[in-house]
C-alpha cells in the first residue's frame, strides 16, 4: 500500500484511497505539474495467492487495452509506471456515482432517462466492437457505469474485457456477473451480441428496479410497470434472447431502435401490413386492367 502523500514518478501525489480490488488499490492523485487530478491504480506484482500472476497479467492487459482507446464514454489511461515491485496505472478520475447507487437511492428510473443512457452505452460498445480486433466488454451492469455530474456516463472496470479471437472457441467459463451475462458467456465464445444481452439486462434493471442477480424469473418490463412503452419492452426482449442469433446483431442496430422505438411496436407493424395489403391489391388491380 502506498502511503498518502507519496509522490510517484516525480509528479503524481497520492491524496487518498478511493477503491480497492483483490490485488489493486485505486487512489486519487494530484499531478503537481499540471495541477490536475487523476485516479492511480496500484498493482502489486506479487502477493500471497497462487493465482497472483494471472491477476496481475489481467490487470496489465486491461491497462494496455485501454491505453489505445479514445472515446468520451471510456476512461483514458495516460501513464503506466513500473518500478519493478509495483505497477501504477494513471487514468481519468471520474467524478459522480455509479448507476447501481442511483438505483439504490432513487429506485427504478424514468424510461426517457434510461433510453438516453442506453444510447450512450450503445455508442461506446459499438466503438469497442469496431476495434481491430474487436473488444468485448463482457461485464455491462449498473455498477460499472458512472453517472457524471453533468449527466453523461462513462463505462468503468475493464477487468474482464478481451480482444475477440474468432478461432478461440471457449474463453469465459467463470467470468461475468450472474444475471447480466448471457448463456454463452459461461460455456463458450463471446462476441458483440454478448454485450448486447448484458446491456438489455442493465436496461431492464434500471427500468424496473429488479436486480437480475436476485433469482427472479425474467419477465418483460411492462409486467413490472405497465406505464412503460411497448417499444422499449420489445427492444429489451430482443436484447436478452437466450440464443445470440435472435438478438440484435450489432449495437448500431440496437441504437437505431432505441432512437425510434415507435417503429417496432405492434401498431406500427399492423400499419405496415395494411400498407402492404393495399399495395398488393393496387398492383393486382392494375394487372387485371392491363
Question: For each predicted feature, which ranges?
Answer:
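AlphaC helix of the eukaryotic protein kinase fold
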Residues: 47-68
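Activation-segment/catalytic-loop signature of the eukaryotic protein kinase fold
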Residues: 80
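Conserved short submotifs of the Hanks-type protein kinase catalytic core
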Residues: 84-98
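Activation segment signature within eukaryotic-like protein kinase domains
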Residues: 117-118
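Protein kinase catalytic-loop region centered on the HRD/HxD motif
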Residues: 123-135
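C-terminal lobe helix-coil module of Hanks-type protein kinase domains
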Residues: 177-263
Amino acid at each position: 500500500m502506498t502511503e498518502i502523500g507519496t509522490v510517484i514518478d516525480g509528479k503524481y501525489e497520492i491524496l487518498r484511497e478511493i477503491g480497492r480490488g483483490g490485488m489493486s488499490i485505486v487512489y486519487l492523485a494530484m499531478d503537481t505539474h499540471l495541477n490536475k487530478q487523476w485516479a492511480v491504480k496500484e498493482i502489486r506484482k506479487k502477493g500471497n495467492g497462487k493465482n497472483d500472476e494471472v491477476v496481475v497479467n489481467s490487470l496489465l492487459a486491461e491497462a494496455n487495452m485501454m491505453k489505445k482507446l479514445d472515446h468520451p464514454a471510456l476512461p483514458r489511461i495516460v501513464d503506466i509506471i513500473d518500478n519493478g515491485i509495483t505497477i501504477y496505472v494513471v487514468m481519468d478520475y471520474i467524478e459522480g456515482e455509479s448507476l447501481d447507487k442511483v438505483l439504490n437511492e432513487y429506485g427504478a428510473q424514468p424510461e426517457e432517462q434510461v433510453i438516453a443512457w442506453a444510447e450512450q452505452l450503445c455508442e461506446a460498445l459499438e466503438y469497442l466492437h469496431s476495434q481491430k480486433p474487436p473488444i468485448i466488454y463482457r461485464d455491462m451492469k449498473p455498477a460499472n457505469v458512472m453517472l457524471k455530474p453533468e449527466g453523461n456516463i462513462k463505462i468503468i472496470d475493464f477487468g474482464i474485457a478481451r480482444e475477440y479471437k474468432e478461432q478461440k472457441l471457449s474463453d469465459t467459463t467463470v467470468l461475468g456477473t450472474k444475471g447480466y451475462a448471457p448463456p454463452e458467456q459461461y460455456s463458450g465464445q463471446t462476441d458483440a451480441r454478448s454485450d448486447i444481452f448484458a446491456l438489455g439486462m442493465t436496461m431492464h434493471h434500471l427500468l424496473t428496479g429488479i436486480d437480475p442477480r436476485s433469482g427472479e424469473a425474467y419477465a418483460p418490463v411492462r409486467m413490472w410497470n405497465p406505464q412503460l412503452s411497448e417499444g422499449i419492452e420489445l427492444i429489451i426482449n430482443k436484447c436478452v434472447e437466450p440464443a445470440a442469433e435472435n438478438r440484435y446483431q450489432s449495437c448500431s442496430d440496437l441504437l437505431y431502435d432505441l432512437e425510434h422505438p415507435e417503429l417496432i411496436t405492434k401498431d406500427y407493424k399492423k400499419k405496415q401490413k395494411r400498407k402492404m395489403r393495399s399495395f398488393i391489391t393496387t398492383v393486382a388491380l392494375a394487372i387485371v386492367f392491363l
